[in-house]
Amino acid sequence: MLKRRIIPCLDVKAGRVVKGVAFLNHRDAGDPVELAAAYDAGGADELVFYDITASSDERAIMVDVVERTAAQVFIPLTVGGGLRTVEDMYRMLRAGADKVSINTAAVLNPQLIEDGARRFGSQCIVLSIDARRVNASDEPPRWQVFTHTGRDPRPTGLDAIEWARRGVELGAGEIVINSMDEDGVGGGYDIDLLRAITEAVNVPVIASGGVGSPEHMYAGLVEGRADAVLAASIFHFGAYTIRDVKQYLAERGVPVRL
């Protein structure tokens, strides 16, 4: 049985790791390279860097962060944020990333998924989806895709489930599904959303947004059927270690790399 993955997520702004609530009110969490090395030593299965820097002229900082991180860690590294072209993807992969994650740019130009997959292989292309529940309380669950979530969330009119399916058809090899309603809150993943996505696609799905405890990760992996779980605050600020989480999951029969 495939091992379930525990993946720390590092939001990088102007060369520092930050974490906010619902994409706002950022707290400094440290140096990205130092944190990445600590997570590697602490048993993380992969790492995700999201560049949330507002200005494109600081993008070179992220390339430097990726290069220095890749020189120190030996687990897969995914990089996203501000990647708008195949050349942007190439720059990050050349710097040392194993995978690239695209979100807003893919919605604006779905061909980017196909072009990236054709050049680098589907295994390199991660489609990240920010979704918000939009149904009324007396309606079946429905989630809409939003873009520009770091600064100015914009509704797209796209159904999150349909967008995930289309992304896979275009060549995405993995899906990250992030609940905007739960992001940074610590109340747990949106299991309904997660389950809907995992049942709709045949590629690995990573749960994101809202984890506050090992119990939430267990729910995401077992009830939500995710292949991996992403977390930030609970690791960055010391609430739990990766080994704490893996021990908890292993004791409950979830296959993890110890």
Swiss-Prot record:
Q: Does the keyword Amino-acid biosynthesis apply?
A: yes
InterPro entries, from UniProt? Aldolase_TIM, His_biosynth, HisF, IGPS_HisA/HisF, RibuloseP-bd_barrel
Gene Ontology cellular-component annotations: cytoplasm
The membrane spanning regions, by residue number, are none
Q: In which pathway does it act?
A: Amino-acid biosynthesis; L-histidine biosynthesis; L-histidine from 5-phospho-alpha-D-ribose 1-diphosphate: step 5/9
Q: Name one Pfam family in it.
A: His_biosynth
Q: Which UniProt keywords are listed?
A: Amino-acid biosynthesis, Cytoplasm, Histidine biosynthesis, Lyase
Instruction: Give the enzyme's EC designation.
Output: 4.3.2.10
Kindly report, in one word, the top-level EC class recorded for this enzyme: lyase
UniProt record, GO biological process: L-histidine biosynthetic process
Alphabetized GO MF terms: imidazoleglycerol-phosphate synthase activity; lyase activity
Compartment(s): Cytoplasm
Q: Subunit structure, briefly? A: Heterodimer of HisH and HisF.
Briefly state the protein's biological role: IGPS catalyzes the conversion of PRFAR and glutamine to IGP, AICAR and glutamate. The HisF subunit catalyzes the cyclization activity that produces IGP and AICAR from PRFAR using the ammonia provided by the HisH subunit.
PANTHER family with a match to the protein in the record:
IMIDAZOLE GLYCEROL PHOSPHATE SYNTHASE HISHF, IMIDAZOLE GLYCEROL PHOSPHATE SYNTHASE SUBUNIT HISF/H IGP SYNTHASE SUBUNIT HISF/H
Q: What is this protein called?
A: Imidazole glycerol phosphate synthase subunit HisF
Q: What is the lineage of its organism?
A: Bacteria, Bacillati, Chloroflexota, Chloroflexia, Chloroflexales
